[in-house]
């Protein structure tokens, strides 16, 4: 799916037209040299930010974890993001990418305390991937080689990139990551299994990203009276599961139909997955008419 970037972006508090101006960052910007920063991605439906409060809560928590002091309040950032959306006259479905880095200084692992952070946001058109949600994806299994603070939405994504490109060359769309015998999540998504009508997912600790869509799906499951367990589970439990799926902000809920060379379960999305997708769809429809 080809992404289409919109012209107007947010850059350090300004709304800038990239056709007229190309914002620049310093050569010794720590985000550029060290990956010293945080990012966030949130969804837009019909031009309206979805679950923005939850995304920004995580954004600020991640900044707090790395002791990066934001040059804005949450309210100021919300206003700037809305200005960017309005300036683009964006009324479609899409994603907003938001990033902040610590700032520029002479290269040193020890950062200065009074740096001026660099931040920006941009919009990308991205229709809902309905076909993927219906047909499902082929996945494989990989060792989780990431660091031990995966709950921080850091710019440092090199392990994810290495795994994602490896499996892409093999024809897979996502990987089930395993750390010391425990299934954690995917390269860019959270992971769930279903067994005996029970939803099971790794607990929200330091070994996974505390996904907003993950949180939302758990909420929907409880509203549907589907039992949810947040616990560690093994790869063997995955193979023996009735259903499994990934969740991510841009992709919502996408079922697994094949693991490695073998068909998984029925080879189609299961009834619990369908039920959760329907509930998610209904919630989006309600969001569109009430916001």
Residue ranges and their predicted role:
Residues 87-100:
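Ordered, amphipathic secondary-structure segments that act as subunit-interaction surfaces
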């Amino acid at each position: 799916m080809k992404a289409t970037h919109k012209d107007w972006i947010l850059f350090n508090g300004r709304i800038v037209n990239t056709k007229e101006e190309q914002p620049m960052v310093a050569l010794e910007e720590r985000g550029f040299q060290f990956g010293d920063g945080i990012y966030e991605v949130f969804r837009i439906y019909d031009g309206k930010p979805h679950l923005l409060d939850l995304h920004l809560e995580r954004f600020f928590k991640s900044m707090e974890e790395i002791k990066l002091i934001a040059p804005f309040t949450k309210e100021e950032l919300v206003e700037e993001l809305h200005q960017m959306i309005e300036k683009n006259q964006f009324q479609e479905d899409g994603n907003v990418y938001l990033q902040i880095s610590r700032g520029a200084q002479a290269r040193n692992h020890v950062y200065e305390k009074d740096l001026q952070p660099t931040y920006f946001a941009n919009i990308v058109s991205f229709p809902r991937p309905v076909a993927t949600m219906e047909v499902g994806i082929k996945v494989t299994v990989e060792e989780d080689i990431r660091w031990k603070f995966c709950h921080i939405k850091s710019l440092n994504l090199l392990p994810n990139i290495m795994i994602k490109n490896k499996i892409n060359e093999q024809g897979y769309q996502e990987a089930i990551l395993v750390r010391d015998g425990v299934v954690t999540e995917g390269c860019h998504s959270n992971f769930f299994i279903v067994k005996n009508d029970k939803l099971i997912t790794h607990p929200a600790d330091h070994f996974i990203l505390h996904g907003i869509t993950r949180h939302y799906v758990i909420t929907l499951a409880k509203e549907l009276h589907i039992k949810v367990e947040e616990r560690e589970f093994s790869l063997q439990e995955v193979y023996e599961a009735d259903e499994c799926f990934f969740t991510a902000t841009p992709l919502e809920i996408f079922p697994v139909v094949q693991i490695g060379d073998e068909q998984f379960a029925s080879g189609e999305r299961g009834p619990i997955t369908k039920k959760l997708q329907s509930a998610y769809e209904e919630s989006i429809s309600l969001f569109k008419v009430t916001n």
